[in-house]
């Protein structure tokens, strides 16, 4: 959430920065609410000061021997009571305005970083670097064809169980998924991340704090009777792990590696990626999440991206790093690097991780602060997939496919899977 004082006092700056995202917005109404709230604060503060003065004068007169029931003292007390009533009315009006202001601020996305490249959409994103040599060939299969030959997952039966865009992993497929999750968690925890397995059902406050609500309500599955939602990413519960807390600066950074199933309705994606593991309603993911001191967030962004890249390198999967332009940024992000893995069968790069710096945007929504010698201020948060497990499996299948129908696995994964390849049953 944006700083309401910044929106109130610098509306042109906010409008210009949101314009970099391609958003044209009239902030007049929001600015008016913020100014009304400020006026009420000033009136309340003035009345409270007058009330304190009257209370002090009453005390002094009594100390000097005045009868507490004397008319002059009683008149002062009556004035004090009237002021208290006026203050109560102003406080109620402030609360109402504050709720309206927060509702509008929650709908505004984060401001892009000054370092973020300008652009309108994904066509203006900029490639930063590549790793590995992409495998190419005319006869290479896409991952769902390989999975069908190896009987790695059930699609039609999953429709019977749930609906389309669900899969049931079977046999070697289920084993490979489990191996990948354990491998990713072990790799990250060996670098100092603390492992987390959070709830997959989260409340509205958690989704609001991370930035999914109110904008992305249609993208999420909701248990309406219980005010609970299926989490679209572990970023949501991990953000709220420290909601309404003050974290001492000496404890920072806090670095978490969280595994969770993720659930997304994929509204608006009809007809896209209807086969295989690329776009599902339910998928597994290992999420990296940092709480950092505001002075250290830029360096942390480089490191969290490198930690996500390390998974792809260990699995010998060629990829490229793309920096998103201002017009393609996610709602809560101020700067993002996407990792795109090469899929030889598809002959294309596909996103497998987004590593984002959110600044104090999520921290303000979730009231997460830190305290150092300079005082108490909002913390900075960062997140990145480390990695999306299903898409990693798809890349492994297409990269390691052999002419005999087997799939050769990278050496780093062999101890977790128990074999160096997937073989036809």
Swiss-Prot record:
Enzyme Commission numbers on file: 6.1.1.11
One GO process term, biological-process aspect: selenocysteine biosynthetic process
GO molecular function, one term: serine-tRNA ligase activity
Binding site for ATP: 264-266, 351-354
One GO CC term on file: cytoplasm
Protein's name according to its UniProt entry: Serine--tRNA ligase
Transmembrane segments: none
UniProt KW Cell membrane keyword: no
Provenance organism: Prochlorococcus marinus (strain MIT 9313)
